[in-house]
Amino acid sequence: MVPVIALVGRPNVGKSTMFNRLTKTRDAIVGDLSGLTRDRQYGDASWQGRSYILIDTGGITGDEVGMDEKMAEQSLMAIEEADYVLFLVDARAGMTAADQMIAEHLRKRNKEAILVANKIDNIDADVARAEFSPLGMGNAIPVAGSQGRGINALMEAVLGHIPRDPVEDALDEDVAEGEEATRIPGPSEKDGIKIAIIGRPNVGKSTLVNRMLGEERVVVYDQPGTTRDSIYIPFERDGEKYTFIDTAGVRKRGKIHEEVEKFSVVKTLQAIKDANVVIFVMDAREGVVDHDLNLLGFALDAGRAVVIALNKWDGMEPGERDYVKTELERRLFFVDFADIHFISALHGTGVGHLYKSVQAAFMSAVTRWPTSRLTQILEDAISVHQPPLVNGRRIKLRYAHLGGANPPLIVIHGNQTDKIPNSYSRYLENTYRRVLKLVGTPIRIEYKGGDNPFEGKKNTLTDRQVNKKRRLMSHHKKAEKKRRDKRK
């Protein structure tokens, strides 16, 4: 299971800055005013091949009322959700009563917490660490979140004991030249292909799992939120091993009231991260709603292969079906690489075809290709459509290699790669998808510019070059003097 890390602390200790630093985004609001984070925010992050989910929370002071009280509830709930807690304190401001209150709460909950002394820039880190020793949370790890100082030491303390993703290890060695494309080790022999069934509440996820399994393994009731936790169900079909991850439906934030249902959100996000393929279930009778797009977007951001299942297709009139198909084409244009199935989980119509799409999406996500193959595709694409000119110079792309899997990451090396427009990146992405016959999985293109070996080096002349330069300068001076004399 992908670990969950929560950032907690009193207001304005740098939690949102740390969130942005670790997730490499600017999703969290950052400022000098306390209370800018009003709700839990989830982010997808990784460190040295180890993926995790990060939760940013509002500050806790212990004397909250009104909106601040709701914010504190969100922070305490994040502590319950998390596997690890990063307890941030302000090294400049020193220890406060709010810090002591949070430390006491963490001890009562028996949570694995690491004390983080933030904002240690321009102050003595050892003195700052000693000031917080009365909290009884062990030695504080000094960091400067705004500058990135101490982040590696912090993440080593949190995630250093967790094994690297086997996919990352498999990519450490490239496919040998001339070798055929091979599958990168992904699912274990025990679990098989892990499939997360996700979607809004009451779209028929548990009914679909039961239909695909052929037995009643998950509680099904016509009421949203019947499944309160993610359920892992191993099974075998046609000699292939699978593990279903059935999740609670994710509701809009404003509709989440019960505490147990709030916990289900992080379970769904964990299931997406833990899966190899996501079956995204939608209600055909309700069509495409904004919350579907948000949930689908998280699956794509996590890089998961996707199969879309439009449930409750039976009983719909032809005109209604045509309208839904038009809406799918219009609103799901960003995931046009995913197979779409029109099914009835209740009656079993079209359900059996999902397995073929799951297999195809999984193989597309974890297959690796030799550098020679990826480079040849790049050269063929350039011969058809060259990169644009920048300041009169043509962008040069030299070679490509595989940099990751699930999703496939193709790293392209060249010059002026930071000037490549998005339209050309989409062209290359579509070319790789078409030639490699990839379905169901997103593709990521990453560029690396060529390093100038002489950058930063002073051009020092040898003694021989210095003498030659002097002779040339002397010759030029004599020649110039002769030309001036002739003019006279």
Swiss-Prot record:
CDD domains: EngA1, EngA2. Residues 467-488 have a biased composition (Basic residues). GO terms for biological process: ribosome biogenesis. SUPFAM superfamilies: P-loop containing nucleoside triphosphate hydrolases (SSF52540). Transmembrane segments: none annotated. GO terms for molecular function: GTP binding; ribosome binding. The keyword Zinc-finger does not apply. Residues 367-451 form the KH-like domain. GTP 1 binds at residues 9-16, 56-60, 118-121. Residues 449-461 have a biased composition (Basic and acidic residues). GTP 2 binds at residues 199-206, 246-250, 311-314. Keywords: GTP-binding, Nucleotide-binding, Repeat, Ribosome biogenesis. Residues 3-166, 193-366 form the EngA-type G domain. Residues 449-488 are annotated as: Disordered. GTPase that plays an essential role in the late steps of ribosome biogenesis. Associates with the 50S ribosomal subunit. PANTHER family: GTPASE DER (PTHR43834:SF6). NCBIfam families: GTPase_EngA (TIGR03594), small_GTP (TIGR00231). Belongs to the TRAFAC class TrmE-Era-EngA-EngB-Septin-like GTPase superfamily. EngA (Der) GTPase family. This is GTPase Der. It comes from Pseudomonas entomophila (strain L48).
